[in-house]
Amino acid sequence: MSSLSKEAVMVHEALLARGLETPLRGALLDRDTRKQRIAEHMTEIMNLLSLDLGDDSLAETPTRIAKMYVDEIFSGLDYANFPKITIIENKMKVDEMVTVRDITLTSTCEHHFVMIDGKATVAYIPKDGVIGLSKLNRIVQFFSQRPQVQERLTQQILVALQTLLGTNNVAVSIDAVHYCVKARGIRDATSATTTTSLGGLFKSSQNTRQEFLRAVRHHN
């Protein structure tokens, strides 16, 4: 972890301490080795499915999937990709809720490796520092780019922001469609799942909680 940013290490350690880190076996192999090994295994899977890898349309599929896994949809497994975060001194003494709604996210169900497609609402009440609004989006995206369950994703975003901002007053809500439900199994095309994680005043103060939940309902 020595080559990682201070913020990445802080967040990783906070998640480990709370039992909320994504289950990993150990240190990641280097990026190129991961891509090579994934492509080899995907080739074998496609062969087992009797797909003709000699066909022009399929020949590069194992390599494409390997690149997609490592560089894109599972890039959040590598804390080297954690967004650069700068916490700005709260010189204006802002003490009201800051809310960002409709943060789009795509993730991957860790049970079936199919898509989770949703939106997040994130809010916090500043203490000593504030964070650039786009960084909230980037943190949501970082933790989305992993095999996930929605409940853990919601809590990971919460703890990351609490750790970076130095305050418990953070709230996160995610509303998402799970393609493991929509495209297979029950094949329910209309249901959505909502998860909410509240900290500090968002949990202890009914008025603060209701203000946040009104913001969540605003986009529904």
Swiss-Prot record:
SUPFAM superfamilies: Tetrahydrobiopterin biosynthesis enzymes-like. InterPro entries: GTP-CH-I_C/QueF, GTP-CH-I_N, GTP_CycHdrlase_I, GTP_CycHdrlase_I_CS, GTP_CycHdrlase_I_dom. PROSITE patterns: GTP_CYCLOHYDROL_1_1, GTP_CYCLOHYDROL_1_2. It catalyses: GTP + H2O = 7,8-dihydroneopterin 3'-triphosphate + formate + H(+). One of its GO terms (biological process) is tetrahydrobiopterin biosynthetic process. GO terms for molecular function: GTP binding; GTP cyclohydrolase I activity; zinc ion binding. Keywords: GTP-binding, Hydrolase, Metal-binding, Nucleotide-binding, One-carbon metabolism, Zinc. It is an enzyme of class 3 (hydrolase). One of its GO terms (cellular component) is cytoplasm. Toroid-shaped homodecamer, composed of two pentamers of five dimers. Belongs to the GTP cyclohydrolase I family. This is GTP cyclohydrolase 1. The lineage of its organism: Bacteria, Pseudomonadati, Pseudomonadota, Gammaproteobacteria, Enterobacterales.
